[in-house]
Structures are given as C-alpha cells and as structure tokens.
C-alpha cells in the first residue's frame, strides 16, 4: 500500500512539473524555401490553420490528388522569420495512370511553356489548364508540371506583381511510415523576360 502511495505521489510531482502542451499549438513545418537568398517557411499550428484563409486551392492540404485527372496539386504558404506571410508557391504535377504518386527518387520535371499565359487564369485553374494546353499545343508524351510563385501582398497591395511561373525539378526522397509523410526537395527558376523579376527558389518539403 505504501509503495502505491509513493508511486502516485511521484506521478503527481512529475505531472505538475511538466509544462502543459496544447495539441492545438504544436508547430508543423511543411516547407522551407530560399527565395533569392532569403529564407521562408510554411510552418503553422492547428490553431493557426483553423483560422487561415486564402489558399490557392479550396483546401488547406499541402499536397493532394485531383479527382478528375492525373494531377497532384501542391501549395505552400511561405512566411518570413517574423511570421509574416510573403508568398504562395503552388501548382500541379501530372503523373501516369498506372503510377502510384509519388515515386521516390524520381525527378518530376516542372516547366512553363513560353506560350502559356497565366495572367488571366484563376490560381486554382492554372495546373489543369496547363495540362490541357500541353495536350493540345505540344507533342510531348510526358507533360511537365508547373509551379507558380505569387506574392501574398498582391491581395492587399496596390502595386501588383504578376504571379511567376517557375521551371526546375522536384523530387521525393523519403517516406516515413510512422507519420506517413513524404520528404523531398526542389530547385526552381523563372524564365526572365524584359522588365520581370528574376527568381531563384530552392527548398525542402515534408508533406502527407
């Protein structure tokens, strides 16, 4: 009996000394990215995520498979070191009908054809429209994916900057069976035209 009392007393002391952690406030990092030498992160808590709005797609998932085509959609909300939201990085990656996306260590190609204009397209339609464009306008049997970088300030700022399509590669390198997350990396650049900004983007992701 005395032993049981001692054990219970010890547990009370241990519990009272532990810092209480609210599950809603646990941080999750989905993406870290360097844009022109500056570091950004898509990191959030469950509490913050519940209140966030304005994602390019009508879901808060960072990666999800389309229902009507063979497209994997990707979206990240990138903030600076002070937590200020600065960019959205979003788009889609096509994959084969028999492919179990994503395949580890496969380089998924991202390329925006110069003739494809995204200026008048809703964000959530860009990836689908680009897949259709490639089917109609190019002879490639293996369509490329597309990722777009968009300044968050565009929504509230009078100085509008066009969303910028990027080209490069994205690769998934690891799958964690415990938390069902895929890890990977990407390297992206835009095709600079007259008067446009040049972007060099690279980073890592952890998604499920």
What are these regions (language model features)?
Residues 1-2, 19:
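N-terminal hydrophobic targeting signals that begin at the initiator methionine
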Residues 2-8:
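Sec-dependent signal peptide recognition
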Residues 14-17:
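C-terminal motif of bacterial Sec signal peptides marking the signal peptidase cleavage site
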Residues 19-26:
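Bacterial lipoprotein signal-peptidase II cleavage site
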Residues 31, 49-174:
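Surface-exposed helix/loop patches within compact recognition domains
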Residues 167-208:
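C-terminal or internal capping secondary-structure element at the end of a domain, subdomain, or sheet
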């Amino acid at each position: 009996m005395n032993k049981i009392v001692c054990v219970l007393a010890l547990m009370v002391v241990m519990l009272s000394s532990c810092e209480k952690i609210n599950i809603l406030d646990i941080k999750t990092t989905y993406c870290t990215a360097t844009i022109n030498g500056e570091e950004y992160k898509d990191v959030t808590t469950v509490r913050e995520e519940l209140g966030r709005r304005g994602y390019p797609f009508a879901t808060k998932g960072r990666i999800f498979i389309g229902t009507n085509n063979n497209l994997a959609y990707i979206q990240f909300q990138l903030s600076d070191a002070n937590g200020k939201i600065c960019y959205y990085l979003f788009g889609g990656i096509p994959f084969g009908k028999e492919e179990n996306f994503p395949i580890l260590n496969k380089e998924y190609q991202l390329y925006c054809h110069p003739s494809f204009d995204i200026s008048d397209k809703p964000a959530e339609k860009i990836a689908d429209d680009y897949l259709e464009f490639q089917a109609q306008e190019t002879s490639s049997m293996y369509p490329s994916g597309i990722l777009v970088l968009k300044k968050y300030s565009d929504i509230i700022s009078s100085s509008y900057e066009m969303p910028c399509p990027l080209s490069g590669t994205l690769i998934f390198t690891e799958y964690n069976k415990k938390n069902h997350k895929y890890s990977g990396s990407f390297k992206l650049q835009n095709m600079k035209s007259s008067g446009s900004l040049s972007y060099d983007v690279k980073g890592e992701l952890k998604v499920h």
